[in-house]
């Protein structure tokens, strides 16, 4: 590399000398001579500069991905690689990749053992408080056999009752509640925090079918059907919900009094007299005609209903 650098510098200096010589010859009026020196000097200077610039960039060596690439490397590089690998293989690592320390082993031993947990399936009717009572031969928590606290206190025996309610057990419990508490006493007393309204569609359809029903008949028709003896409201699961239209204790029927059954489409009413039926038939025929007239706007179609000319406010055109 040093020899090449010296040669490049000498090549550039020689080109500059030829340019200076051509300039000197040009002053003596000899154009056929100084032109040759000028051309040779310019080529040598430009070539030397380009050559030097190309040497500034690092050389790239392409190594094929083959097992024979070791022959391309120099013996010095191969020796360095072998020495480094041998040193790594001979010197043991200061710490193995995974070492189980004694602190971790002690922590694993200090964890509680859950092998003493027992499972007992009980039905809904059985008393779960018996599980909470300690047995006679069971040692108390916090005391060992010697009467003093020791390492045995960490894994002392404990019992806890875990009650899981299943669907079958709930159905059995509901049946027992309905059998043991008949009548309206099973319903929770007091106002419910949540309430829901019944659908008003049934009310609209009922008004359309019987437009002449009296308010007394409507109140009786809206009252729900009297349920047989038993719980009228849902069980404890739905005690927070209640219907606003449900009858209260004051509205409950007395003994010997019958309520009408409220149906969604056909409303039942008490038997009316012949006079009431006749009035209902007369008014029932007139109301549809009035409703049809209300549907139209403007002047009616009949010739007799037209307004007279005096009320219209203008005179008819008499010009012929």
UniProtKB/Swiss-Prot annotation:
Residues 1-72 are annotated as: Regulates channel membrane trafficking and ion conductance. Residues 1-5, 54-320 are cytoplasmic. Expressed primarily in kidney. Expressed in specific nephron segments and in the stria vascularis of the inner ear. Changing residue 10 to S: In BARTS4A; intracellular but some plasma membrane localization as well; fails to activate CLCNKA and CLCNKB channels. Changing residue 98 to A: Stimulation of CLCNKA and CLCNKB currents enhanced; intense localization in the plasma membrane with no intracellular localization observed. The keyword Transcription regulation does not apply. Changing residue 56 to S: 74% reduction in palmitoylation. Abolishes palmitoylation. Residues 27-32 are extracellular. The modification Phosphoserine is found at residues 110, 168. It is linked to Bartter syndrome 4A, neonatal, with sensorineural deafness: A form of Bartter syndrome, an autosomal recessive disorder characterized by impaired salt reabsorption in the thick ascending loop of Henle with pronounced salt wasting, hypokalemic metabolic alkalosis, and varying degrees of hypercalciuria. BARTS4A is associated with sensorineural deafness. This is Barttin. It comes from Homo sapiens. The lineage of its organism: Eukaryota, Metazoa, Chordata, Craniata, Vertebrata.
């Amino acid at each position: 590399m040093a020899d090449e650098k010296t040669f490049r510098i000498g090549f550039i200096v020689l080109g500059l000398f030829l340019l200076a010589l051509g300039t000197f010859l040009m002053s003596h009026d000899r154009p056929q001579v100084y032109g040759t020196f000028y051309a040779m000097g310019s080529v040598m200077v430009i070539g030397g500069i380009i050559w030097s610039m190309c040497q500034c960039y690092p050389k790239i060596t392409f190594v094929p991905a083959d097992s024979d690439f070791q022959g391309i490397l120099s013996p010095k590089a191969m020796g360095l690689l072998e020495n480094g690998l041998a040193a790594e293989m001979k010197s043991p690592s200061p710490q193995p990749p995974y070492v189980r320390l004694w602190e971790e082993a002690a922590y694993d031993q200090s964890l509680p053992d859950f092998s003493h947990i027992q499972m007992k399936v009980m039905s809904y009717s059985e008393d779960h408080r018996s599980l909470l009572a300690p047995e006679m031969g069971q040692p108390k928590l916090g005391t060992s056999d010697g009467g003093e606290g020791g390492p045995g206190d960490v894994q002392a025996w404990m019992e806890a009752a875990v009650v899981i309610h299943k669907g079958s057990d709930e159905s059995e419990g509901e049946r027992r509640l309905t059998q043991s508490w008949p009548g309206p006493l099973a319903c929770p007393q007091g106002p419910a925090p949540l309430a829901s309204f019944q659908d008003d569609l049934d009310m609209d359809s009922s008004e359309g079918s019987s437009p002449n029903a009296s308010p007394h008949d409507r109140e009786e028709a809206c009252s729900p059907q009297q349920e047989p003896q038993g719980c009228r409201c849902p069980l404890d699961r739905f005690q927070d919900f209640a219907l606003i239209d449900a009858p209260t204790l004051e509205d409950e029927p007395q003994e010997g009094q019958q309520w009408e059954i409220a149906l969604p489409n056909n409303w039942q009413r008490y038997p009316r007299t012949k006079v009431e039926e006749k009035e209902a038939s007369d008014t029932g025929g007139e109301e549809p005609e009035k409703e049809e007239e209300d549907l139209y706007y403007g002047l009616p179609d009949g010739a007799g209903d037209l307004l007279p000319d005096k009320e219209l406010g203008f005179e008819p055109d008499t010009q012929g």
